[in-house]
């Protein structure tokens, strides 16, 4: 599965769009992959976007379970480490919104932000996060070229 954390086609008037940014091409590519996608709504996603996408994007959050841990995925404009959703000890909060990759413990929980594939900020690379529960380092931050630049171990996630 591919989890998209919002702002699927457009990133709002505050962000300059990079050269080559082509939302219609993104739309076509994502619609072809619709059976593999799970999405949450970003602060720039609208009902108009939903009209052209063939998979749901307007859920405020998604909750799923991995190896006995709850993962709460949301865009990040409402729920984030500063204003967390109701979490139990050991839960993982997964956000986008800032376009800056981050990871680490907060309180009794763990936080992950994959950054952005299209409009990264704070000199971070265009990139994404791979979550592979079968790996000794289940979290890998990668550039668009596929280069892993940061991993998070099981021990770090367990803190």
Model-derived segments and their meaning:
Residues 1-66:
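Core catalytic region of metal-dependent phosphoesterases/phosphodiesterases
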Residues 2-7, 37-43, 72-75, 92-97, ...:
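Active-site neighborhood of phospho(di)ester-bond hydrolases with catalytic His/Asp-centered motifs
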Residues 10-12, 43-50, 78-84, 94-106, ...:
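Active-site environment of divalent metal-dependent phosphoester hydrolases
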Residues 36-38, 56, 70, 110, ...:
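Conserved beta-strand segments of alpha/beta enzyme cores
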Residues 51-57, 92-93, 119-121, 130-133:
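Short linear motifs in intrinsically disordered
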Residues 54-102:
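Internal catalytic-core helix/loop-beta-alpha segment
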Residues 67, 107, 111-159:
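Binuclear metal-dependent phosphoesterase catalytic core
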């Amino acid at each position: 599965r591919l989890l998209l954390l919002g702002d699927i086609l457009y990133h709002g008037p505050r962000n300059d769009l990079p050269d080559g940014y082509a939302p219609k091409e993104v739309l076509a590519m994502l619609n072809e992959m619709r059976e593999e996608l799970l999405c949450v709504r970003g602060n720039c996603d609208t009902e108009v976007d939903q009209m052209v996408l063939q998979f749901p994007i307007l859920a405020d959050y998604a909750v799923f379970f991995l190896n006995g841990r709850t993962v709460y995925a949301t865009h990040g404009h409402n729920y984030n480490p500063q204003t967390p959703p109701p979490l139990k000890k050991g839960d993982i909060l997964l956000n986008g919104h800032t376009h800056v990759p981050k990871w680490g413990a907060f309180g009794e929980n763990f936080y992950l932000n994959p950054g952005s594939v299209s409009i990264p900020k704070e000199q971070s690379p265009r990139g994404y996060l791979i979550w592979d529960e079968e790996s000794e380092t289940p979290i890998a931050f990668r550039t668009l070229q596929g280069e892993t630049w940061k991993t998070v171990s099981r021990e770090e996630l367990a803190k």
